[in-house]
Curated annotation (Swiss-Prot):
EC code(s) of this entry: 2.4.2.17
This protein's pathway: Amino-acid biosynthesis; L-histidine biosynthesis; L-histidine from 5-phospho-alpha-D-ribose 1-diphosphate: step 1/9
Any one Gene Ontology cellular component term annotated for this protein: cytoplasm
Described function: Catalyzes the condensation of ATP and 5-phosphoribose 1-diphosphate to form N'-(5'-phosphoribosyl)-ATP (PR-ATP). Has a crucial role in the pathway because the rate of histidine biosynthesis seems to be controlled primarily by regulation of HisG enzymatic activity.
Protein name, per record: ATP phosphoribosyltransferase
GO biological processes: L-histidine biosynthetic process
Length: 220
């Protein structure tokens, strides 16, 4: 891990992922006292606000920017964080964007698993090793279910939210590797250098998540 670069200790740089998590992340941060109005249909990747810079990144890049100190903190799915292998501080489970990573096969498939296709090779290899399954892991970029349907792989490892895609394609979950949701992650050096900004944000987000859980309202 590289220490956070020298900047104004009162200025935060946040790494936020494009896509499904971004809107919910911005809403939750606003509730925590950081109102961030990101322009729609803008090609800008860096947004400046009073006391805060927001970097819009691809999901898998958020842990990298935080770990290497370019961003002080970020929000990213636990699945992406695990796959990145980055040693960042993870103080709050934000409890939105919930899903789980599963081993999936065609319904009724019973033969040995010799090849597994996935976007999550680190997680897949760890799971297979823990089960003593000597399968080849093939990394794909999308439409993972198709690998099981075409015979490219005997099984796939992929995220599942509702399971509707699996049912529509005659696929079923064999096992759950882990559950995932959005997490707040923090650069460890920044936690010391910008403690006055980061600690209140962490505590406020934690309070909001706990309150919403108690009220059964979700956190948005």
């Amino acid at each position: 891990m590289t220490p956070a670069p020298a900047r104004d200790p009162d200025h935060l740089t946040l790494a936020l992922p494009k896509g499904r998590i971004l809107e919910d992340a911005v809403t939750l941060l606003a509730r925590a006292g950081l109102p961030l109005t990101l322009p729609e249909k803008s090609r800008a990747l860096r947004h400046e606000f009073p006391g805060v810079t927001v970097l819009e990144l691809r999901n898998q890049d958020v842990p990298v920017y935080v770990d290497l100190g370019v961003a002080d903190a970020g929000i990213v799915g636990k699945d992406v964080l695990i796959e990145s292998g980055r040693a960042v501080y993870e103080p709050v489970d934000l409890r939105f964007a919930a899903c789980h990573l599963s081993l999936i096969r065609e319904v009724g498939a019973s033969g040995p698993i010799g090849r597994v296709a996935t976007k999550y090779p680190r997680s897949a290899r760890a799971y297979l090793a823990s089960r003593g399954i000597p399968a080849e892991v093939v990394k794909l970029s999308g439409n993972i279910e198709l690998a099981a349907l075409t015979g490219l792989a005997d099984a796939v490892v992929d995220l599942v939210q509702t399971g509707s895609t699996l049912r529509a394609n005659h696929l079923e979950e064999i096992d759950v590797l882990y559950h995932s949701s959005a997490r707040l992650i923090v650069n460890r050096a920044a936690l010391k250098l910008r403690r006055a900004r980061l600690r209140p944000l962490i505590e406020r987000l934690r309070e909001l998540v706990e309150r919403d859980a108690q009220e059964g309202t979700g956190n948005l």
